[in-house]
Amino acid sequence: MTTLTITRPDDWHVHLRDGEVLKDTVRDISRYNGRALIMPNTVPPVTNTEMALAYRDRILKEQHGEQFEPLMALYLTDNTTPEEIRAAKATGKIVAAKLYPAGATTNSDSGVTDAKNIYHVLEAMEEVGMLLLVHGEVTHHHVDIFDREKEFLDTVLAPIVNDFPNLKIVLEHITTADAAQFVNNASDNVAATITAHHLLFNRNHMLVGGIKPHFYCLPILKRNTHQQALIEAATSGSKKFFLGTDSAPHAKGAKESACGCAGSYTAHAALELYAEVFEKEGKLENLEAFASFNGPDFYGIARNADTVTLEKSAWDVPESMPFGNDIVVPIRANEQIEWKVK
């Protein structure tokens, strides 16, 4: 196969940051996506409706594709109120709220300290039909970083799923076979996003032959058996899994340092990277559902009406890309990607 035409995709989990870098991050995400769900862990975090709408306006000023629509999310804190959830839902532009366990990832210090603290908020979300997005890691110091997702499933997510059976929940950027199994075994109200980099790489890519800081992300890359479980889930055709890049840019110097930031940048070539994975598995026929159908279907939003075409045409990824007044090193820098969006 040399070309593949699919319904225009969406990215259900992306970080655009804010300020001067938006012109670059929005350029990449709006190039062929119909919609993207914008993560709210900016500085300061997007904790209320007014902030979310203002952030949306800043994004729209930089968009490059007329078809592109940013979908917004609120950042949940211990102080979020049910009234804020209702106000956000009423806008029609804020489609979800994000649970970051405090300290779990970049700019998450204002996150939720205990899920029980927001049960009254989850009740309001269940009532109005707002989705809950979850960064699925515990932050207890005694839990090994490679075990944080599994521990979260058992101690935090399972009780939420049980206590709020009508709440739609997306377990974001899953990284383990345990998470894939949890989602498969849960009700149809539980789904998951999977990143391109967790499908393409495992912890050996990050650690063998020297530390590769641009592979460092949270949740951290796991062993190859977990990687294979993610590949099987993503390419299976199951409606429970869909595209969410978790593309998370940091300036080159913030990654290549003694205490580097977590996040991998894939928005420059996300669909192309996923296409490589699906082709290698002999499952290209399932890429459209993963990239273009399952996400909007789960969110209760119409699928995009137009299409994009991928062609089998290798191209060179640049060594770096503009990032405001700095540069970002994209995944597969100085290497080739086999597919290209026409």
UniProtKB/Swiss-Prot annotation:
Residues where substrate binds: H15, L16, R17, N41, H135, L218, H250, A262
EC number of the protein: 3.5.2.3
Binding site for Zn(2+) 2: K98, H135, H173
Gene Ontology biological process terms, A to Z: 'de novo' pyrimidine nucleobase biosynthetic process; 'de novo' UMP biosynthetic process
Key word Metal-binding present: yes
Cofactors, names only: Zn(2+)
EC class name: hydrolase
Recorded GO CC terms: cytosol
One Pfam family here: Amidohydro_1
Cofactor note: Binds 2 Zn(2+) ions per subunit.
SUPFAM superfamilies, sorted: Metallo-dependent hydrolases (SSF51556)
Residue positions where N6-carboxylysine is found in the record: K98
Subunit and partners: Homodimer.
Summary of the function given for this chain in its UniProt record: Catalyzes the reversible cyclization of carbamoyl aspartate to dihydroorotate.
Family assignment from sequence similarity: Belongs to the metallo-dependent hydrolases superfamily. DHOase family. Class II DHOase subfamily.
HAMAP family: PyrC_classII
Protein name: Dihydroorotase
Species in which this protein is naturally found: Vibrio parahaemolyticus serotype O3:K6 (strain RIMD 2210633)
